[in-house]
């Protein structure tokens, strides 16, 4: 198990160049990394977490599954939204939820906001970097509570029809990492 984790860690680091992932290039990729535009769209559309390269999260718990998100209360003046997440984990097979204040942020020396900082109801502060976004989907580079990379997430509005653009980017960025399905048909109520 330690060998597998060490290998995954080394492979994840191979994606990083001088503490900066290969996709963290504002000139080349900034058009698809606009965090404020993404948060505004989140108010209009619900998204499901389709795939992830990690399985434990400080908010969603261990072995999280069936994660979905939406947002409300768009505040243009303060530039934030109230994000709502629903999920299950190995501690409870009943849907749980959390509300978090989501604010656009800047990472990797960007001039434009390319990350989202979440403040949970219990005061945790977590940051996700928007590695890629397109119509109806996005790829997140989730940072752990200590700021180190936790892994990649693939989100889409329809888990049965993930746009090729996001699937290709996710597969490129997550190459060599263990990938698991998070939102599947098992998540739907019977």
Curated annotation (Swiss-Prot):
Keywords: Disulfide bond, Pharmaceutical, Secreted, Signal
Organism domain of life: Eukaryota
Tissue specificity: Expressed in salivary glands.
One cellular-component annotation, GO: extracellular region
InterPro entries in the record: Calycin, Tick_his-bd
GO BP, sorted A to Z: symbiont-mediated perturbation of host defenses
SS bond list: 66-187, 137-166
First-listed, main subcellular location of the protein, grouped into a coarse class: secreted
SUPFAM superfamilies per record: Lipocalins (SSF50814)
Subcellular location field: Secreted
Alphabetical list of Gene3D superfamilies matching this protein: 2.40.128.20
Binding positions for histamine 2 per the UniProt entry: 118, 155
Claim: Cell membrane is one of the keywords in the record: no
GO terms for MF: amine binding
Residues bound to histamine 1: 54, 57, 60, 100, 153
Subunit architecture: Monomer.
Family: Belongs to the calycin superfamily. Histamine-binding salivary protein family.
Function statement: Salivary tick protein that acts by scavenging histamine at the wound site, outcompeting histamine receptors for histamine, thereby overcoming host inflammatory responses. Binds histamine with a high-affinity (Kd=18 nM). Contains two binding histamine sites (H and L), that appear to bind histamine with differing affinities (high and low). In vivo, when tested on a mouse asthma model, shows a profound inhibitory effect on allergic asthma.
Protein name as it appears in the record: Female-specific histamine-binding protein 1
Species of provenance: Rhipicephalus appendiculatus (Brown ear tick)
The organism's taxonomic lineage, starting at the top: Eukaryota, Metazoa, Ecdysozoa, Arthropoda, Chelicerata
């Amino acid at each position: 198990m330690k060998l597998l984790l060490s290998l995954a860690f080394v492979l994840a680091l191979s994606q990083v160049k001088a503490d900066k992932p290969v996709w963290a290039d504002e000139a080349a990729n900034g058009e698809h990394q606009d965090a404020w535009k993404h948060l505004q769209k989140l108010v209009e559309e619900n998204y499901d977490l389709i795939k992830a390269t990690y399985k434990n999260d400080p908010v969603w718990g261990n072995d999280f599954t069936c994660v979905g998100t939406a947002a409300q209360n768009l505040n243009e003046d303060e530039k934030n939204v109230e994000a709502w997440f629903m999920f299950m984990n190995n501690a409870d097979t009943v849907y749980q939820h959390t509300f978090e204040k989501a604010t656009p942020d800047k990472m990797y020396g960007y001039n434009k906001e390319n990350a989202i900082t979440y403040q949970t109801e219990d005061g945790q502060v977590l940051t996700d970097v928007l590695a890629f976004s397109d119509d109806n989907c996005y790829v997140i580079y989730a940072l752990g509570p200590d700021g180190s990379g936790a892994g990649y997430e693939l989100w889409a509005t329809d888990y049965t029809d993930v746009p090729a653009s996001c699937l290709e980017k996710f597969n490129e960025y997550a190459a060599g990492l263990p990938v698991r399905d998070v939102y599947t048909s098992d998540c739907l109520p019977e």
